[in-house]
């Protein structure tokens, strides 16, 4: 969208309502619920890790801008897309597999090819947000969706709400 309007996109923001004493995971597009970070906040954390200039990403299952604006992600297939940036010494790549129906489907194989980073070796750090990683909402549902969680449950939810580093490869 920024490209189509020739805007220099420097960051991501959100717009949300926040009301005190609301049920857990009630909505309002907020980034946290009762002090526990929601999975969407981890997306913003990943945006914050991206450095340098945005570079082109292509794929055979990415929705185009017009489809996103006109009808969001409602076709028979998921939007398997990405966002990437690079500077002189690093590259960051964010890949997603998303559909508005919010139904868990099998993982899609993804191949990432990075060109133009002059190095013979690299360290790859992987972060994941899915039903098992960086997702306080899924943990809360597995707890039985408590509206009055115990201190112990809140501690577990707080940990699950953080962006989880899944692997580091050299």
Model-identified regions with their sequence ranges:
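Catalytic-core region of carbohydrate-active enzymes that cleave or remodel glycosidic bonds
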Residues: 1-53, 86-87, 108, 115-119
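Short, solvent-exposed loop/turn segments at secondary-structure junctions
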Residues: 19-20, 62, 98-100
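Solvent-exposed, non-transmembrane amphipathic alpha-helical segments
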Residues: 24, 32, 60-67, 146
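Feature marks hydrolase-like catalytic cores characterized by long aromatic- and Gly/Pro-rich stretches
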Residues: 36-43, 48-81, 108-112, 162-170
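Carbohydrate-binding surface patches
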Residues: 67-135
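Acidic, Ser/Thr/Pro-rich beta/coil linker or hinge segments at domain junctions
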Residues: 108-109, 115-169
């Amino acid at each position: 969208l920024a490209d189509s309007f020739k805007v220099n996109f420097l960051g991501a923001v959100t717009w949300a309502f926040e009301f005190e004493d609301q049920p857990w995971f009630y909505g309002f597009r907020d980034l946290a619920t009762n002090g526990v970070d929601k999975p969407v906040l981890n997306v913003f954390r990943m945006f914050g890790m991206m450095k340098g200039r945005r570079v082109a990403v292509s794929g055979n299952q990415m929705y185009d801008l017009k489809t996103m604006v006109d009808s969001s992600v409602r076709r028979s297939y998921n939007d398997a897309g990405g966002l990437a940036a690079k500077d002189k010494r690093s590259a960051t790549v964010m890949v997603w597999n998303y559909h508005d129906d919010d139904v868990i489907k099998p993982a899609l194989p993804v191949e990432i090819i990075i060109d133009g980073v002059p190095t013979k070796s690299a360290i790859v750090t992987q972060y994941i947000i899915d039903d098992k990683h960086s997702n306080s909402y899924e943990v809360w549902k597995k707890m039985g969706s408590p509206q009055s969680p115990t201190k112990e449950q809140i501690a577990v939810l707080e940990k699950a709400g953080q962006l989880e580093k899944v692997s580091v490869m050299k």
